[in-house]
């Protein structure tokens, strides 16, 4: 097969086109939640790597209503794509960690904003009570809905070290329960967490492939100023491997994707943080520049998603904007 026609991996824009005949953009929201490993329920201080300022746009302020945040987010994109529609992305902290009626009000307020065509709800695998899941199951019948779980690692030792406050068994249960309700279920993982080797991380792809995940976000570990992990790095830098050369990370990602189930949609490969907060790694690349390098390297290696996945019998290819298999 000609490598130029092959779909190197299942990408998110192609996935969205299955649901929407128009351009769709996520708008991040900060709805004023916290996390059980921050407020003392399961721990204090939150995840050791976390500083929510790294992914909250300027319009995300808890003193602003959901409607105001969405309207300001729309203004940010409208000048370039006036016909664009939006997904309200409840991103900051744990967006299911509150009383049910309050959650319903926030979700439903977002859906009343003109141009909002669905919800993406980011949360933890230990914060999906049955009552909320039943509500989301019903909501899913009326609007586009995706629940995105912060998995971060499949290794319980790592999860404990980074103060997640949950286990991988919690992830398995939450993902299975959510997907069983017919809800699109996504995951988020971090490559390069302390104590994890190249082989450990690549093996993780096969483990996650056993779950009914529709999408997966991958990103590199970033050291962020003011976090507990940044302090740990100052104390013992030898315990960290930060992919200071982008080529090393690209090759790891390719190895990972080759072992990933072919139908999982890979939503992203890297995270970007404000320069004033980022300690390392700083590759000086925009997301599209990273993706271009990744795709070039995949073609050089003859790599594609699922190439080494244990149950892979078909190759997914891309031709004339249509997904096909051979």
Residue ranges and their predicted role:
Residues 47, 109-116, 203-218, 291-305:
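Structural recognition of alpha->loop->beta junctions
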Residues 2-16, 20-25, 215, 223-326:
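Auxiliary Fe-S-binding modules of radical SAM enzymes
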Residues 53-73, 77-100, 115-128, 144-171, ...:
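Core AdoMet radical
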Residues 25-29, 86-88, 119-121, 145-149, ...:
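Hydrophobic faces of well-ordered beta-strands that scaffold small-molecule active sites
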Residues 67-74, 103-108, 133-137, 171-175, ...:
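Generic structural signal for well-ordered alpha-helices
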Residues 77-79, 106-114, 134-144, 176-180:
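Acidic (Asp/Glu)-rich catalytic clusters
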Residues 169-229, 247-270:
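Conserved C-terminal portion of the radical SAM core fold
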Residues 1-87, 325-326:
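N-terminal [4Fe-4S]-dependent radical SAM core
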């Amino acid at each position: 097969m000609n490598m130029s026609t092959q779909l190197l991996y299942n990408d998110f824009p192609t996935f969205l086109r299955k649901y929407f005949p128009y351009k769709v953009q996520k708008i991040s929201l900060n709805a004023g939640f916290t996390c059980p490993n921050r407020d003392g329920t399961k721990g204090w201080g939150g995840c050791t790597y976390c500083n929510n300022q790294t992914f909250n746009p300027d319009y995300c302020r808890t003193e602003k209503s959901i409607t105001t945040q969405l309207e300001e987010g729309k203004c940010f994109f409208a000048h370039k794509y006036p016909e664009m529609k939006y997904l309200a992305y409840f991103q900051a902290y744990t967006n299911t960690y509150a009383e049910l009626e309050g959650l319903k009000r926030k979700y439903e307020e977002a859906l009343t904003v003109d141009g909002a065509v669905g919800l993406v709800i980011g949360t933890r695998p230990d914060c999906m009570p049955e009552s909320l899941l039943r509500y989301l199951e019903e909501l899913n019948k009326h609007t586009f809905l995706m629940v995105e779980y912060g998995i971060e690692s499949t290794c319980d030792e790592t999860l404990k070290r980074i103060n997640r406050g949950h286990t991988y068994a919690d992830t398995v249960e939450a993902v299975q329960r959510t997907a069983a309700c017919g809800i699109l279920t996504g995951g988020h993982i971090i490559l390069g967490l302390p104590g994890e080797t190249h082989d450990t991380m690549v093996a993780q792809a096969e483990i996650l492939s056993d779950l009914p995940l529709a999408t997966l976000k991958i990103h590199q570990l970033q050291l962020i100023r003011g976090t507990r992990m940044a302090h740990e790095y100052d104390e013992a830098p030898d315990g960290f491997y930060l992919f200071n050369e982008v080529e090393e990370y690209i090759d790891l990602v390719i190895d990972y994707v080759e072992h990933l189930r072919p139908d999982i949609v890979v939503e992203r490969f890297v995270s970007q943080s404000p320069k004033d907060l980022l300690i390392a790694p700083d590759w000086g690349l925009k997301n599209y520049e990273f993706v271009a390098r990744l795709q070039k390297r995949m073609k050089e290696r003859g790599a594609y998603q699922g190439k080494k996945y244990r149950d892979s019998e078909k190759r997914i290819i891309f031709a004339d904007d249509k997904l096909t298999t051979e």
